[in-house]
Design a protein with these regions (language model features):
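Solvent-exposed beta-strand/loop surfaces of large extracellular or lumenal domains
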Residues: 83-107, 420, 691-716
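A low-complexity, Ser/Thr/Gly/Pro-enriched, surface-exposed linker/loop concept
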Residues: 2-48, 54-115
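Gly/Pro-rich turn-and-neighbor structural signature
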Residues: 324-327, 331-347, 386-401, 448, ...
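Beta-sheet entry/capping signal
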Residues: 69-70, 118, 125, 135, ...
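Catalytic and substrate-binding clefts that recognize carbohydrates or anionic sugar/phosphate headgroups
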Residues: 1-4, 52, 77, 97-316, ...
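Flexible loop/turn segments at secondary-structure boundaries
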Residues: 79-81, 249-251, 267-270, 329-333, ...
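Catalytic core of carbohydrate-active enzymes
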Residues: 502-515, 521-532, 545-549, 553-563, ...
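Aromatic-lined carbohydrate-binding/catalytic grooves of carbohydrate-active enzymes
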Residues: 314-484
Length: 741
């Protein structure tokens, strides 16, 4: 959200006030009883006592929840805000210190000599100027990594929506009595808080959740608001108000790596070197703004600290790393279809670990009723038993809505389990299912009711749930049970939804067996794996978009990720199916799914069967490597599928690569995005050993840090083992579920 008109001017609709200097600083205790720093930054310089009248100030609090992490809370007016709060995990061993070197002021409070107020936690500090021009500097190991300069922070009124003061007196020295006696009708305007942090030369920005726009975010406007917009626009299912800033170094001691996490669940807007090309600006509506600076030795170190700060990742069970096969969405399927597909995979010697039933396991117009459509599945208990005897896990589709035709609608409405309009009527619309109502997950009784419906399915034999949707949540004219601000509850809704589902899975299956297959996400959702990339399109461009979105998501605090192999929308041509199969089975989680087309390989061609068999077996055989890497990634709080620069931080060439990636520490994967098999990929310096290859290809490529161009059949792609690393394999494994540590 831009407030300025170029470099010099503000947009006419905004009244912008900035801290000009820090008038006072003091040491306080934070909520954990640790030392914190509080300052009062005034909107004009204090040169005499008269300057203390008719001006505002920002109260700034600096605190530390964990080592090398500093939180900043900016407050204009104190408000009793009902915006939901993300979970912040504090470290008991953190011991921040506060140092205040006061400036010198004269008898009227005017600054004569500047001072500093500093909070330090481990290797990170924030230093705020006192009694001089406002500046706030963040230093890691005594090196400045970013700063908030004069006029960066701001308290902003949108005077097109109202005014607390007559416009003629805004910024004037009119007395309070004169203001109160004014005959102008005053309406509270929309108010925003803003911060801008410096960007050093050659600093690249990543993150913000799953975004399908260019991988490096410099130059972009990013709005943090969950939307169901597919994979082909700037909208995102998984918005995370966090960015990773990286300035490549020439060695491990010279790079700069830090993250910025804006701890606001309501929509937040970022201008990434766009409104001001030397800064990242972020803002949110309201009277306060809280953010955290997270510093580290490396980009992986920063991501790990952010991951742990917001709850840490959970490890999904081994069977989830195998192949998932779906009924697809709008296809015609029944018990007969399902068994035909499963038997077809067996006959063709293709390992299968999970079978997924999409929406129409329930009757249309009744999602969700949590009951099998007996016309298509007359004996669901028997069907689930037969699937389990084939050593398959079963996933079924759900969403957090109850359609009006569902038998559950009347009960939910009567008992107050749905989000309401402000007038008390149930909030409904016809988008998706007719008369959709939203489960109100802020109501504990509604959560228990919803979980009980899922519990019955788990007792029947269902193993996990695809938690679809969670983005289209009302932001206006909406009332939540706990009084949550709808603007903040919108993004937070997916957390409560997936938390409820994950909890019942843990209760019934145990934590080691709990897994969801989720589309939407917010801060902290990494606790509820796995997430998939949403509704992509069946073409090579969308395949590339999917990878780019995944890498963006995985540089935002998440560990595991999947996508619809072959694309979701439209029909998939055989060549795309085969290329995407390679890519999909070299992701952390692998699922065939579509909209109007089945995704079993023999419906494409016989070579598709061969490709699916080869790469599914390869992934199963790599389970010792994949699962050990998954455990390590969870422990460190880093992604399993990761962009190249996370592993090669001293190689500047890796920082823009978004068409290849590392799968764990050892494996480099370069998917092929065309029918012909032409691929161009970059190998960092060293020797790289092929794991698969076409006939005639050399086993090892030695790179000086250079690009290579090759042509591959559908049975091969650039898949290399890094020099000095290994990939543990077990060729005796038949399925991922067979893997035991």
């Amino acid at each position: 959200m831009k407030f300025t008109d170029g470099y010099w001017l503000n947009k006419e609709q905004y009244r912008i006030e900035n801290p000009k200097e820090t008038y006072e600083a003091k040491k306080i205790l934070d909520e954990e009883g640790n030392d914190a720093l509080q300052t009062f930054a005034t909107y004009s310089k204090i040169r005499e006592r008269g300057n203390m009248l008719n001006i505002g100030n920002t109260t700034l609090c600096a605190f530390s929840p964990a080592k090398d992490i500093i939180g900043i809370r900016l407050t204009h007016f104190e408000r009793k805000d009902k915006t939901p709060d993300y979970e912040i995990v504090t470290q008991e061993e953190v011991k921040p210190t506060v140092s205040i070197i006061p400036g010198v002021v004269d008898g009227q409070g005017a600054g004569i000599e500047s001072g500093t107020a500093t909070l330090t936690t481990e290797n990170l500090s924030v230093e705020i100027s006192l009694n001089t021009q406002f500046r706030m500097s963040f230093k890691y190991k005594n090196q400045e990594i970013t700063a908030s300069e004069l006029n960066a922070q701001a308290s902003i009124d949108d005077i097109s929506t109202g005014a607390l003061y007559p416009l003629s007196v805004a910024g004037s020295q009119m007395s309070i009595n004169e203001v109160q006696q004014s005959s102008i009708n005053l309406v509270r305007p929309k108010h925003y808080m803003r911060e801008m942090l410096n960007l050093d030369v050659d600093t690249k920005i990543y993150g913000f959740g799953e975004r399908f726009t260019p991988f490096v975010k410099n130059g972009q406007t990013v709005d943090i608001i969950n939307k169901d917009g597919g994979t082909g626009s700037e909208q995102s299912y998984k918005n995370i108000p966090f960015y990773l800033a990286c300035k490549p170094g020439i060695d491990e001691n010279t790079g700069i790596y830090y993250g910025v996490f804006v701890n606001e669940s309501q929509p937040t807007s970022f201008e990434v070197a766009s409104e001001n090309v030397q800064r990242v600006q972020f803002s949110t509506e309201g009277e306060s703004l809280e953010y955290y600076i997270i510093a580290g030795e490396s980009a992986k170190d920063v991501l790990g600290k952010f991951n742990k700060l917001t709850g840490g990742s959970s490890l999904p069970p081994a069977w989830t790393f195998g192949l998932w096969l779906s009924t697809s969405f709008c296809t015609d399927y029944s018990e007969e279809t399902v068994m035909k597909f499963i038997e077809g995979m067996e006959e063709r010697d293709i390992p299968l670990d999970v079978f997924h039933f999409d929406c129409f396991w329930m009757k249309g117009f009744e999602w969700c009723n949590f009951e099998w459509d007996k016309n298509s599945f007359p004996d669901p208990e028997g069907l689930l038993e037969r699937l389990h005897k084939k050593n398959l896990k079963v996933c079924v589709w759900i969403n957090p809505y109850i359609a009006q035709k569902s038998p559950l609608f009347a009960e939910g409405s009567e008992k107050g389990y749905f989000i309401l309009h402000e007038d008390g009527e149930v909030w409904q619309w016809d988008l998706w299912q007719a008369g959709n109502a939203y489960i109100d997950f802020t109501n504990p009784k509604a959560v228990a009711w919803y979980k009980e419906k899922l519990r019955n399915l788990l007792k029947m034999g269902v193993d996990c749930f695809k938690t679809d949707f969670g983005e289209r949540v009302p932001m206006y004219d909406a009332k939540f049970y706990d009084g949550s601000n709808p603007a903040g509850a919108h993004n937070y809704y997916t957390y409560l939804y997936n938390e409820a589902v994950y909890e019942v899975l843990k209760e019934e299956k145990g934590k080691e067996e709990a897994v969801v297959f989720a589309r939407s996400a917010t801060v902290g959702s990494q606790k509820f794996p796995v997430h998939w990339g949403g509704d992509n399109v069946s073409n090579y461009q969308s395949m590339a978009d999917t990878l780019r979105g995944g890498l963006s998501f995985l540089t935002s605090g998440f560990t595991f990720w999947s996508h619809d192999i072959g694309g979701f929308e439209e029909e998939t041509p055989p060549d795309l199916y085969k290329r995407w199969t390679q890519f999909g089975l070299l992701s952390s989680h692998s699922r065939y799914h579509g909209n109007v087309q089945y995704r079993v390989p023999w419906l494409f061609d016989e070579e598709a069967v061969e490709v699916t068999r080869k790469f599914t077996k390869l992934k199963v055989q790599m389970m010792p490597y994949l699962y050990s890497q998954a455990e390590k990634a969870v422990k460190l709080g880093i992604p399993l599928v990761r962009p190249m620069f996370l592993e090669f931080e001293n190689d500047p060439n890796t920082y823009s690569l978004d068409l290849q990636y590392m799968l764990g520490d050892s494996l480099l994967v370069a998917p092929i995005f065309n029918k012909e098999g032409n691929v161009r990929f970059y190998l960092p310096k060293g020797k790289w050993t092929r794991l698969v290859k076409d006939e005639g290809m050399e086993d090892v490529l030695e790179s000086k840090g250079q690009w290579f161009q090759e042509n591959h059949s559908f049975l091969s792609l650039p898949l290399f083992i890094r020099e000095g690393y290994k990939v543990e394999m077990n060729k005796e494994l038949k399925k991922a579920s067979d893997y035991k540590k």
